[in-house]
Amino acid sequence: MARRGFSCLLLSTTATDLPVKRRT
């Protein structure tokens, strides 16, 4: 369960981090 939560968090972070870096 912890692994699943980590993957979800990582995916969410990447999804929000990529557009921001690309925008800058």
Swiss-Prot record:
Cellular component GO terms, alphabetical: cytoplasm; extracellular region
Transmembrane portions of the chain: none
Predominant location: secreted
One Pfam assignment: Humanin
Keywords, in A-Z order: Cytoplasm, Secreted
Source taxon at top rank: Eukaryota
GO biological process, alphabetically ordered: negative regulation of execution phase of apoptosis
The protein's role, per its UniProt record: Plays a role as a neuroprotective and antiapoptotic factor.
Record PANTHER family: HUMANIN-LIKE 1-RELATED (PTHR33895:SF18), HUMANIN-LIKE 4 (PTHR33895)
Protein name: Humanin-like 9
Taxonomic classification: Eukaryota, Metazoa, Chordata, Craniata, Vertebrata
